[in-house]
Protein backbone atom coordinates (compact mmCIF):
# COMPACT_ATOMS: atom_id res chain seq x y z
CA UNK A 1 0.00 0.00 0.00
CA UNK A 2 2.78 2.43 0.84
CA UNK A 3 4.82 1.59 -2.27
CA UNK A 4 7.70 0.00 -0.36
CA UNK A 5 7.48 -3.45 -1.99
CA UNK A 6 8.39 -3.24 -5.67
CA UNK A 7 7.34 -6.83 -6.37
CA UNK A 8 3.75 -6.09 -5.30
CA UNK A 9 1.34 -4.75 -7.89
CA UNK A 10 -1.86 -2.83 -7.46
CA UNK A 11 -3.45 0.58 -7.46
CA UNK A 12 -4.04 2.89 -4.53
CA UNK A 13 -6.89 5.23 -5.25
CA UNK A 14 -8.07 7.93 -2.85
CA UNK A 15 -10.92 10.30 -3.63
CA UNK A 16 -10.74 9.54 -7.36
CA UNK A 17 -6.96 9.99 -7.68
CA UNK A 18 -4.67 7.03 -8.42
CA UNK A 19 -1.19 7.03 -6.92
CA UNK A 20 1.95 5.38 -8.33
CA UNK A 21 4.39 3.59 -6.02
CA UNK A 22 6.59 6.69 -5.97
CA UNK A 23 3.65 8.97 -5.13
CA UNK A 24 2.51 6.58 -2.39
CA UNK A 25 5.87 6.95 -0.67
CA UNK A 26 5.05 10.65 -0.27
CA UNK A 27 1.48 10.34 1.00
CA UNK A 28 1.79 7.22 3.18
CA UNK A 29 3.45 6.64 6.52
CA UNK A 30 4.03 3.16 7.90
CA UNK A 31 4.49 2.11 11.50
CA UNK A 32 6.26 -1.24 11.31
CA UNK A 33 5.63 -4.15 13.64
CA UNK A 34 9.32 -4.12 14.58
CA UNK A 35 9.86 -0.42 15.21
CA UNK A 36 13.58 -0.96 15.82
CA UNK A 37 13.97 -0.61 12.03
CA UNK A 38 12.52 2.89 11.97
CA UNK A 39 14.05 4.71 14.92
CA UNK A 40 17.09 6.73 13.82
CA UNK A 41 17.75 9.75 16.00
CA UNK A 42 19.47 10.43 19.31
CA UNK A 43 16.34 11.42 21.25
CA UNK A 44 12.62 10.77 21.34
CA UNK A 45 11.92 14.46 20.62
CA UNK A 46 14.25 14.44 17.59
CA UNK A 47 12.50 11.31 16.30
CA UNK A 48 9.15 13.07 16.26
CA UNK A 49 10.64 16.28 14.80
CA UNK A 50 12.25 14.24 12.00
CA UNK A 51 8.82 13.06 10.83
CA UNK A 52 7.27 16.50 10.58
CA UNK A 53 6.47 17.66 7.04
CA UNK A 54 8.45 20.21 5.07
CA UNK A 55 11.99 21.45 5.26
CA UNK A 56 11.26 23.37 8.45
CA UNK A 57 11.34 20.15 10.49
CA UNK A 58 13.88 21.61 12.84
CA UNK A 59 13.76 22.49 16.49
CA UNK A 60 11.84 25.75 16.06
CA UNK A 61 9.68 26.64 19.08
CA UNK A 62 6.52 25.91 17.08
CA UNK A 63 7.71 22.46 15.97
CA UNK A 64 8.99 21.58 19.44
CA UNK A 65 5.65 22.60 20.99
CA UNK A 66 3.76 20.46 18.47
CA UNK A 67 6.09 17.50 19.02
CA UNK A 68 5.78 17.83 22.80
CA UNK A 69 1.98 17.88 22.52
CA UNK A 70 2.11 14.62 20.54
CA UNK A 71 4.53 13.10 23.06
CA UNK A 72 2.15 14.10 25.86
CA UNK A 73 -0.71 12.38 23.99
CA UNK A 74 1.44 9.22 23.82
CA UNK A 75 2.51 9.47 27.49
CA UNK A 76 6.14 9.97 26.40
CA UNK A 77 7.00 13.57 27.31
CA UNK A 78 9.15 12.55 30.32
CA UNK A 79 11.32 10.56 27.87
CA UNK A 80 11.80 13.30 25.26
CA UNK A 81 15.58 13.51 25.85
CA UNK A 82 16.07 9.72 26.01
CA UNK A 83 17.59 7.71 23.18
CA UNK A 84 14.73 5.76 21.53
CA UNK A 85 16.68 2.49 21.60
CA UNK A 86 16.94 2.74 25.40
CA UNK A 87 13.16 2.58 25.81
CA UNK A 88 10.95 -0.45 26.42
CA UNK A 89 9.29 -2.15 23.45
CA UNK A 90 5.95 -0.52 24.16
CA UNK A 91 7.54 2.92 24.53
CA UNK A 92 9.38 2.48 21.21
CA UNK A 93 6.08 1.49 19.61
CA UNK A 94 4.50 4.70 20.92
CA UNK A 95 7.44 6.78 19.63
CA UNK A 96 6.87 5.34 16.15
CA UNK A 97 3.15 6.10 16.43
CA UNK A 98 3.93 9.65 17.63
CA UNK A 99 6.15 10.07 14.56
CA UNK A 100 3.31 8.88 12.33
CA UNK A 101 0.99 11.46 13.88
CA UNK A 102 3.62 14.19 13.43
CA UNK A 103 4.10 13.28 9.75
CA UNK A 104 0.63 14.59 8.88
CA UNK A 105 0.50 12.12 5.99
CA UNK A 106 -3.00 11.48 4.62
CA UNK A 107 -2.58 7.67 4.68
CA UNK A 108 -1.10 5.85 7.68
CA UNK A 109 -0.53 2.09 7.83
CA UNK A 110 -0.05 0.44 11.22
CA UNK A 111 1.38 -3.09 11.32
CA UNK A 112 0.49 -4.68 14.69
CA UNK A 113 0.48 -1.31 16.52
CA UNK A 114 -0.35 -2.86 19.89
CA UNK A 115 2.67 -5.15 20.07
CA UNK A 116 4.45 -4.44 23.34
CA UNK A 117 1.67 -2.21 24.71
CA UNK A 118 -0.08 -2.71 28.02
CA UNK A 119 -3.87 -2.32 28.20
CA UNK A 120 -3.78 1.34 29.26
CA UNK A 121 -1.48 2.37 26.41
CA UNK A 122 -3.31 0.17 23.88
CA UNK A 123 -6.48 2.08 24.69
CA UNK A 124 -4.61 5.39 24.52
CA UNK A 125 -3.20 4.51 21.10
CA UNK A 126 -6.64 3.34 19.92
CA UNK A 127 -8.10 6.72 20.88
CA UNK A 128 -5.30 8.52 19.00
CA UNK A 129 -5.77 6.34 15.91
CA UNK A 130 -9.52 6.96 16.01
CA UNK A 131 -8.81 10.68 16.25
CA UNK A 132 -6.62 10.48 13.14
CA UNK A 133 -9.40 8.72 11.24
CA UNK A 134 -11.98 11.22 12.49
CA UNK A 135 -9.75 14.04 11.19
CA UNK A 136 -10.04 12.63 7.66
CA UNK A 137 -6.91 10.52 7.41
CA UNK A 138 -7.08 7.07 5.85
CA UNK A 139 -5.94 4.55 8.44
CA UNK A 140 -5.09 0.94 7.61
CA UNK A 141 -4.39 -1.38 10.54
CA UNK A 142 -2.97 -4.88 10.30
CA UNK A 143 -3.65 -6.59 13.61
CA UNK A 144 -4.73 -9.67 15.49
CA UNK A 145 -6.01 -7.62 18.46
CA UNK A 146 -9.84 -7.72 18.62
CA UNK A 147 -10.14 -5.16 21.43
CA UNK A 148 -8.03 -2.68 19.47
CA UNK A 149 -10.18 -3.28 16.38
CA UNK A 150 -13.39 -2.66 18.32
CA UNK A 151 -12.00 0.54 19.88
CA UNK A 152 -10.85 2.31 16.73
CA UNK A 153 -11.90 0.56 13.52
CA UNK A 154 -15.12 0.90 11.58
CA UNK A 155 -14.46 -1.53 8.72
CA UNK A 156 -12.82 -4.95 8.66
CA UNK A 157 -11.14 -6.78 5.81
CA UNK A 158 -10.21 -10.41 6.49
CA UNK A 159 -7.28 -11.74 4.48
CA UNK A 160 -6.20 -15.36 4.46
CA UNK A 161 -2.99 -16.38 2.71
CA UNK A 162 -3.05 -13.07 0.82
CA UNK A 163 -6.63 -13.46 -0.41
CA UNK A 164 -9.72 -11.49 0.54
CA UNK A 165 -12.05 -13.72 2.57
CA UNK A 166 -14.65 -11.19 3.70
CA UNK A 167 -15.18 -7.54 4.53
CA UNK A 168 -17.79 -5.72 6.59
CA UNK A 169 -18.62 -2.73 8.77
CA UNK A 170 -18.39 -2.92 12.56
CA UNK A 171 -21.10 -0.39 13.45
CA UNK A 172 -23.80 -3.00 14.01
CA UNK A 173 -24.20 -6.15 16.07
CA UNK A 174 -23.81 -8.37 13.00
CA UNK A 175 -20.38 -6.91 12.23
CA UNK A 176 -19.19 -7.35 15.81
CA UNK A 177 -20.48 -10.95 15.80
CA UNK A 178 -18.58 -11.66 12.58
CA UNK A 179 -15.43 -10.28 14.16
CA UNK A 180 -15.97 -12.40 17.27
CA UNK A 181 -16.51 -15.52 15.12
CA UNK A 182 -13.37 -14.74 13.15
CA UNK A 183 -11.24 -14.63 16.27
CA UNK A 184 -12.87 -17.77 17.67
CA UNK A 185 -12.05 -19.52 14.39
CA UNK A 186 -8.51 -18.07 14.32
CA UNK A 187 -7.78 -19.72 17.66
CA UNK A 188 -8.03 -23.03 15.80
CA UNK A 189 -5.17 -22.12 13.47
CA UNK A 190 -4.91 -20.70 10.01
CA UNK A 191 -2.94 -17.86 8.53
CA UNK A 192 -5.46 -15.04 8.84
CA UNK A 193 -5.01 -11.31 9.15
CA UNK A 194 -7.48 -8.53 9.81
Q: PLM features: residue spans?
A:
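Catalytic Walker B motif of ABC-type/P-loop ATPase nucleotide-binding domains
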Residues: 108-111
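Conserved beta-strand-loop-alpha-helix hinge in the C-terminal portion
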Residues: 163-188
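H-loop/switch region of ABC-family ATPase nucleotide-binding domains
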Residues: 143-144
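Conserved ABC ATPase "signature" region
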Residues: 60-79
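Hydrophobic anchor residue at the start of the ABC signature
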Residues: 97
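Conserved ABC ATPase signature
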Residues: 83-87, 91
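Conserved ABC transporter NBD signature motif
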Residues: 10-24
Amino acid sequence: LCGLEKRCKGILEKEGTSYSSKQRLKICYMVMQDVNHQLFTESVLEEVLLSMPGKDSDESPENVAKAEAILTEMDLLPYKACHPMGLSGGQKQRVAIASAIASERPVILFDEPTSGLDLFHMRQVADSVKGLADSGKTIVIVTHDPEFILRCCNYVIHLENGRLEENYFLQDTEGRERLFNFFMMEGGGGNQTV
